[in-house]
Regions:
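Active-site and substrate-binding clefts of carbohydrate-active enzymes
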Residues: 1-68, 72, 76-162
Length: 162
């Protein structure tokens, strides 16, 4: 068996394969996840990603200042803020993961607890929006953050990946 390094060194005259879109879902395609019934979730997803990206960028700047490593900024009153922002980011990531569960679109498409699925999608979206709105404040209120950290607490390690 060739290693990745061996494969990279070999000439590029091998067959080129292009994967096709397929799914274990109905008909072998993505109709369950890409149809008019569930299309509403995609703009929501992209807005959540944009909020995550913005907060991550802000977090990087604040974390650099607090560590004293960025532009010679001394450690000081902002030292606690990066930890709080990281908690907000971690919970937003959890909410985003829960939002992306393929079950919701499946349930809506099959009209199997569709209202529950829509409620869950809307709930996770609203959670991300509320967390973001609070996280960008100079002195964020962590009440909602604490509540959601208890309620939607999957992947406790997710903050380490940010």
């Amino acid at each position: 068996m060739a290693s990745l390094e061996d494969s990279i060194r070999e000439p590029a005259d091998k067959d080129v394969h292009k994967p096709i879109f397929s799914s274990w879902g109905e008909g072998g395609f993505g109709e369950v996840w890409m149809n008019d019934e569930v299309a509403f979730q995609y703009p929501m997803f992209f807005r959540m990603r944009k909020m995550m990206d913005d907060l991550k960028s802000r977090f990087s700047k604040v974390a650099g200042k607090a560590s004293g490593s960025a532009h010679g900024v001394a450690r000081g009153k902002d030292c606690a803020k990066p930890a709080t922002m990281k908690r907000f980011l971690a919970q937003m990531a959890r909410e985003l993961v829960l939002f992306q569960a393929s079950d919701w679109a499946f349930m809506i498409h099959n009209n199997s607890a569709a209202d529950y699925a829509r409620t869950r999608l809307n709930g996770h979206y609203e959670n991300v929006c509320a967390l973001y709105k609070e996280a960008v404040k100079a002195n964020p209120d962590t009440k909602l953050l604490k509540k959601l950290e208890q309620k939607n607490n999957l992947f406790p390690w997710i903050g380490e990946c940010l």
